[in-house]
Curated annotation (Swiss-Prot):
It is an enzyme of class 3 (hydrolase). The keyword Iron does not apply. This is Basic phospholipase A2. It comes from Vipera berus (Common European adder). The keyword Glycosyltransferase does not apply.
Length: 12
């Protein structure tokens, strides 16, 4: 999902 993608970016 879009939210999951955003969280992935923040983790980096």
């Amino acid at each position: 999902s879009l939210l999951e993608f955003g969280m992935m970016i923040l983790e980096e």
